């Protein structure tokens, strides 16, 4: 009993598997780009198309259906569009002008149940190329018919209308085939006789003329705009350059004013510094001069003390003739030396003062010129004053020496003066470059050579007479008095009295 049950279960299972396999193999689906055409019995009523003859077909789109084995069959029908290139040979237009046309058409099977059923009736079982060839022949035929009903000008000027007319006429025949025209365009219309080219020449010329005019106008406007832009740019540049120049001028004026103020302040400071320096140096110079004046005064006092000391020494030794003579000579020499020292010191001091004043003048020349001139004037005045004092002191000492030593001092001075006097008297002889002596044969002093040498001795012998005649000084008499031929004792007494009187006068002063 178990075996029959197992067999029954096995048969049922097998049948179930077989049914599932049959269902899987017979269930058909349609994609979005196709339609499933089901024919046969037991089609039902959904998506079923019935034609005028009562024939029924089931059309499935975007879904699926079970195809009954033995009773039904299914075939897919592509709904994809097709591109058709259509062209015509030479076709005579309404005017009898032969033209050719090329176009492009996009066709597909319609989307309604009736259009799909019509297309299935026409093309089911045919290839895609067969379907496209049939549609192309229909389009080319209608394209030729439309070309023959229009003029060349209408075709050339209104291609849109030409395309629409071809599409309108061809759509009626293609609809009977279940096809629709998605788009139709005319790519080219041409002829072999140059008719279309001739039609375009006037327009081309007009267009070129208009283009040239427009180009010329555009160029003119461009040049005008460019000229205006250049003018505005140059104007802006000039204004900018003017502003920059004005700003630079203002800046330079400010800089010049600033430099002028700086230079003025610096000049004032330098002038003030130079003036202060000049005043300080002037004060230092004045102090140095005061110190030198004091030193000179001290030196004069020392010299006066030395003179007094020598006078005392002379007083102690005046009774001796030899000592008196020697003392007289020494005092004369001392007086002369004191005179020379005084003159040398005065000149040295004068030179130093003038050099310092000149250096001070050069250093503060310029801005402190007035102060330098003032300092120079004061310095020169001081030099003149000191020089006058020195000369006065020297003359005073000479006068004092004359008062003290009398004729001895005068004699000493004359003796020292005689060589210079003789030199100046014989100076004309030194200017003689050459002497030619002509000897006539005489002898003795009258001969030529002796006579020339006697000129000099005669000149020296006549020197005393010329000195006495010009100055009143008798050198011969002074020598006799000084050597003792005169009244020497009286002279000594007179000299002693003169010295005492000079001392009394100096003490009273």
From Swiss-Prot:
Intervals of motif EA repeat 4: 390-394
Record's note on what induces expression? Transcription starts during stationary phase. Few foci are seen in exponential phase cells; the number of foci increases as cells enter stationary phase (at protein level). Few foci are seen on rich media, when cells are grown in minimal medium more foci are seen (at protein level). Expressed at low levels in rich media during exponential growth, more highly expressed in stationary phase on sporulation/biofilm-inducing media, activated by spo0A probably via AbrB (at protein level). Surfactin induces expression via spo0A.
Gene Ontology biological-process annotations: protein localization to plasma membrane; regulation of cell shape
Where does it primarily localize? membrane
The short motif EA repeat 3 is annotated over: 370-373
Q: Where is this motif: EA repeat 2?
A: 357-360
**Intramembrane segment spans (from-to):** 4-24
Q: Where is this region: Not required for correct localization?
A: 485-509
UniProt-listed CDD domains: SPFH_flotillin
Q: Where is this region: Required for correct localization?
A: 203-509
Tell me the protein's name.
Answer: Flotillin-like protein FloT
User: What organism does the record attribute this protein to?
Assistant: Bacillus subtilis (strain 168)
């Amino acid at each position: 009993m178990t075996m029959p049950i197992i067999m029954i279960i096995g048969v049922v299972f097998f049948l179930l598997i077989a049914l599932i396999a049959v269902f899987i193999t017979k269930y058909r689906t349609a994609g979005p780009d196709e339609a499933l055409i089901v024919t046969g019995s037991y089609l039902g009523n959904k998506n079923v198309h019935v034609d005028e003859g009562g024939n029924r077909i089931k059309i499935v789109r975007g879904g699926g259906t079970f195809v009954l084995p033995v009773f039904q069959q299914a075939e897919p029908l592509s709904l994809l569009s097709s591109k058709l290139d259509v062209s015509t040979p030479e076709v005579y237009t309404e005017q009898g002008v032969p033209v050719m046309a090329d176009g492009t058409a996009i066709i597909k099977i319609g989307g309604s149940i009736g259009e799909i059923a019509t297309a299935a009736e026409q093309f089911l079982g045919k290839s895609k190329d067969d379907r496209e060839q049939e549609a192309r022949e229909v389009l080319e035929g209608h394209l030729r018919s439309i070309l023959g009903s229009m003029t060349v000008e209408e075709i050339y000027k209104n291609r849109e209308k030409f395309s629409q007319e071809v599409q309108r006429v061809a759509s009626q025949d293609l609809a009977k085939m279940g096809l629709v025209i998605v788009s139709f365009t005319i790519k080219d219309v041409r002829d072999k006789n140059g008719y279309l080219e001739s039609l375009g020449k006037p327009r081309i010329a007009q267009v070129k003329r208009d283009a040239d005019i427009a180009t010329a106008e555009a160029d003119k406007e461009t040049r005008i705009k460019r000229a205006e832009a250049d003018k505005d740019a140059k104007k802006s540049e000039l204004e900018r350059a003017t502003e920059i120049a004005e700003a630079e001028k203002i800046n330079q004026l400010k800089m010049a004013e600033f430099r002028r103020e700086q230079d003025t302040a610096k000049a004032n400071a330098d002038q003030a510094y130079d003036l202060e320096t000049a005043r300080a140096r002037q004060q230092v110079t004045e102090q140095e001069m005061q110190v030198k004046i004091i030193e000179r005064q001290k030196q004069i006092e020392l010299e006066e003390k030395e003179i007094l000391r020598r006078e005392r020494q002379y007083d102690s030794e005046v009774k001796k003739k030899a000592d008196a003579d020697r003392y007289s000579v020494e005092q004369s020499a001392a007086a002369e030396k004191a005179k020379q020292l005084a003159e040398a010191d005065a000149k040295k001091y004068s030179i130093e003062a003038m050099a310092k004043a000149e250096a001070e003048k050069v250093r503060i020349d310029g801005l402190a010129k007035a102060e330098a001139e003032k300092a120079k004037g004061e310095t020169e005045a001081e030099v003149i004053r000191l020089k006058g004092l020195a000369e006065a002191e020297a003359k005073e000492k000479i006068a004092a020496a004359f008062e003290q030593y009398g004729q001895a001092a005068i004699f000493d001075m004359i003796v020292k003066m005689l060589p210079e006097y003789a030199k100046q008297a014989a100076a004309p002889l030194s200017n003689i470059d050459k002497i030619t002596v002509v000897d006539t044969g005489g002898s003795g002093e009258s001969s030529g050579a002796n006579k020339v040498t006697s000129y000099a001795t005669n000149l020296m012998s006549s020197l005393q007479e010329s000195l006495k005649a010009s100055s009143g000084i008798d050198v011969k008499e002074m020598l006799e008095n000084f050597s003792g031929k005169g009244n020497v004792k009286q002279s000594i007494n007179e000299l002693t009295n003169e010295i005492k009187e000079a001392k009394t006068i100096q003490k009273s002063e």
